[in-house]
Amino acid sequence: MLLLLLTVSCTMKFSKEVYGEGKILSVTASVFADSIDNPGVQLVDVRTPDEFAAGNIPGSVNIDVLTGHFGETAATMLDKAYTVAVYCRSGNRSKNAAKTLSMMGYNVVELDGGYNDWVKSYGDVK
């Protein structure tokens, strides 16, 4: 996990914020792609189930941030020992999810620009 954070911080420009115990890196689609290639990174799509079903990044799990129990669901599905990579449609919901996860003690990589930017760089994925 530390190696991932050091690699990202040394190779690309990103926005770094600290909330609670965890750290958040907000990164471009290309850096996000490199990040999720690392073993142990937990990939989370925080959009609605319908949005997720319409297309998602392979390997992601869906935890809808708009539900009233996002934190509880994340706590049962995610391991704090590993970085969590989050994305939504445009980057707004994933920023909120990243803040919540950070406050819970997770280290988070967030896709700035969301799935929309991912599709521009890598095409639509179903």
Q: Could you tell me what each predicted segment is?
A:
Residues 1-8:
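Sec-dependent bacterial lipoprotein signal peptides
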